[in-house]
Amino acid sequence: MRALLFLALVGAAVAFPVDDDDKIVGGYTCRENSVPYQVSLNSGYHFCGGSLINDQWVVSAAHCYKSRIQVRLGEHNINVLEGNEQFVNSAKIIKHPNFNSRTLNNDIMLIKLASPVTLNARVATVALPSSCAPAGTQCLISGWGNTLSFGVNNPDLLQCLDAPLLPQADCEASYPGKITNNMICVGFLEGGKDSCQGDSGGPVVCNGQLQGIVSWGYGCALKDNPGVYTKVCNYVDWIQNTIAAN
């Protein structure tokens, strides 16, 4: 889903040519099972991503909320049964109590699985942050979202993108008045590489720790409009307390 805030001048979209590499946007096909914490949220179709943080809990974006979700793990090609998948239904879905669907502040959600998953080489957890990552840190973004800035091409194979954490000043300048201290920007101010619709809820992993959740942006891969992500390091206590209480 990545909450898409449409450009006012959609008709002028052709004035922004972007070099589409036919991936996440501008990314590459991940090596199979190289992102074992990546999950697909399914309600008869893939609609969002998420990250496995222990054998019974997944973290995603609150704007991905549905009352019933099947979590699919161990996936590479989401349209083919490859034999390594685990499909588990949700038992509890818990949005952050202060999630604001208008501003997308606190865009984080926890999903308790109906039963623990089997951890192996293809299904593994990602660590929560021990501290907030500084600007310039290189991160990996992944998902099965749209691979085009203009038009739609939803890939079968998991897509990856290497991108840096941007300075908060650049993030705020890109989206004046819209960036809270619970949001970070990751990507490229020049455009061309970004997450997109369908990547929502998925991971931004930096040095082995989950630092971001795909949240929103103006369009995808547009100049001066980098992707905006939930700042996971602000929520470690909430995550741990919520899991302990449930």
UniProtKB/Swiss-Prot annotation:
Ca(2+) binds at residues 75, 77, 80, 82, 85. Its cofactor is Ca(2+). Activated by autocatalytic cleavage. Cleavage by CTRC inhibits autoactivation. The keyword Disulfide bond applies. Residues 24-244 form the Peptidase S1 domain. One of its GO terms (molecular function) is metal ion binding. PANTHER family: TRYPSIN-2, TRYPSIN-RELATED. Serine protease capable of autoactivation. This is Trypsin-4. It comes from Mus musculus. The gene is Try4.
